[in-house]
Amino acid sequence: YEIPLRLVGSEMCIRDRVGIDEAAFYGPKLDIQYKNVYGKEDTIVTIQIDMLLAEKFGMEYIDVDGTRKRPYIIHRTSLGCYERTLALLIEKYAGAFPLWLAPEQIRFIPIADRHLPYVNEIAARLEAAGIRYTIDERAEKMGYKIRQAQLEKIPYMIIAGDNEAETNTLSVRSRRDGDLGSMTAAELLDRLIDEISNKKA
């Protein structure tokens, strides 16, 4: 029963090793391990072939030849797998997720309320392309808003004031690269889509 599990790993290009005497009492299992930030191995996914529970519960099926057969049960992690994956990613990136993974990809920072219509217009274009954003409409100083976005590890901050609205541009700051200067909405969108589609860190 180990051979099919190893074939699955091989087809998925997963480097494997046989853990002698590590199988569960009910049958062989496949554990997907990863190294955390401390270099320690943790299990992220488990798939197990259970050869005991079907008998214990009296489970049977009728095979194509009409005979009764005892099924094997496949255990797998489901919800725990997602939780462990999220924990791994949060730990690895320390909350500074790459753009493609960040829950909030863009933070718009209008300098004053009168710039909100322009920001909303640009935000609608980005939203149509699948970009996730928020607009910081708080009555706070711009420097404070930028600092907050940096502390929250938002990948991009978009600042819009009179000059940007008049020239149909945006002032762009990147968490990773700092001040990127002025861009049109089309230029910004091209950059974002390239970074997301290529899964850039």
What residue spans do the PLM features occupy?
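Single conserved hydrophobic/aromatic residue that forms the stacking wall/gate
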Residues: 1-14
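Short glycine/threonine-rich loop-to-helix capping motif typified by GTGT followed
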Residues: 10, 26-39, 115-117, 146-152
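Generic structural signal for residues in well-ordered beta-strands
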Residues: 15-18, 133-135
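Short beta-alpha junctions and helix-cap segments that line functional grooves
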Residues: 18-20, 29, 45, 144-148, ...
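A translation/RNA-centric and nucleic-acid-associated enzymatic feature enriched
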Residues: 20-96
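Broad gene-expression machinery/nucleic-acid interaction feature
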Residues: 27-31, 56, 103, 153-155, ...
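Generic long, charged, amphipathic alpha-helical segments
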Residues: 93-145
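C-terminal structured "cap/appendage" subdomains that terminate the fold
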Residues: 123-192
